[in-house]
């Protein structure tokens, strides 16, 4: 597993940063994790900075977080992500989202929810769900399956 997070802006409250870093540290047990914070700026400059980062990862699977994307359950994500056999780059935009040209470059768009979240919460959810997905895919005990989920999981294997 090789994951890169491209994130616009710095978290102002260090406690959010601490929690995000903890999930990424745990995720590191399953492979390499890169974390790139780009400065908050106007949308065109953010797009330019993201494009520059993507140039370094031309063959990567690109995932943009956006409200118009598809929602996944944790179990669906745990099935999808580990099946990708190349580096995965996740992009979280700034206050105005991600530029259309970056979304067009994306292989898929992932919506955390139909609701809109503050940047800090979206980042923390991303980090936590990535850890949960790989932990679940590797038989870890972090995610607690209901009896029905266990039964469905066995059927789908």
Identify the role of each PLM range.
Residues 1-23, 27:
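N-terminal beta1-alpha1 ligand-phosphate binding loop
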Residues 100-157:
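Structured adenosyl-cofactor binding patch, chiefly the S-adenosyl-L-methionine
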Residues 11, 67-70, 94-97:
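Short glycine-rich anion-binding loops that position phosphate/pyrophosphate groups of nucleotides
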Residues 5, 63, 93, 126:
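Conserved RecA-like P-loop NTPase ATPase core
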Residues 17-24, 47, 100-103:
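Short, surface-exposed alpha-helical segments at coil->helix boundaries
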Residues 30-89:
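S-adenosyl-L-methionine/SAH cofactor-binding core of RNA-modifying enzymes
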Residues 2, 85-94:
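Loop/turn-to-beta-strand initiation segments
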Residues 15-17, 73-75, 99-102, 121:
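Short glycine-/acidic-enriched loop or helix-start segments at secondary-structure transitions
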């Amino acid at each position: 597993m090789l994951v890169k997070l491209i994130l616009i802006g710095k978290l102002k409250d260090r406690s959010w940063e601490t929690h995000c870093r903890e999930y990424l540290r745990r995720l590191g047990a399953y492979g390499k994790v890169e974390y790139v914070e780009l400065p908050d700026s106007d949308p065109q400059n953010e797009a330019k900075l993201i494009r520059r980062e993507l140039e370094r990862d031309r063959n990567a699977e690109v995932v943009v977080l956006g409200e118009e994307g598809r929602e996944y359950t944790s179990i669906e994500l745990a099935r999808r992500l580990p099946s990708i056999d190349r580096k995965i780059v996740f992009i979280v935009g700034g206050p105005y989202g991600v530029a259309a040209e970056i979304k067009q470059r994306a292989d898929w768009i992932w919506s955390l929810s139909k609701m809109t979240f503050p940047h800090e919460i979206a980042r923390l959810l991303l980090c936590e769900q990535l850890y949960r997905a790989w932990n679940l895919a590797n038989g870890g005990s972090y995610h607690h399956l209901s009896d029905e989920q266990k039964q469905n999981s066995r059927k789908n294997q």
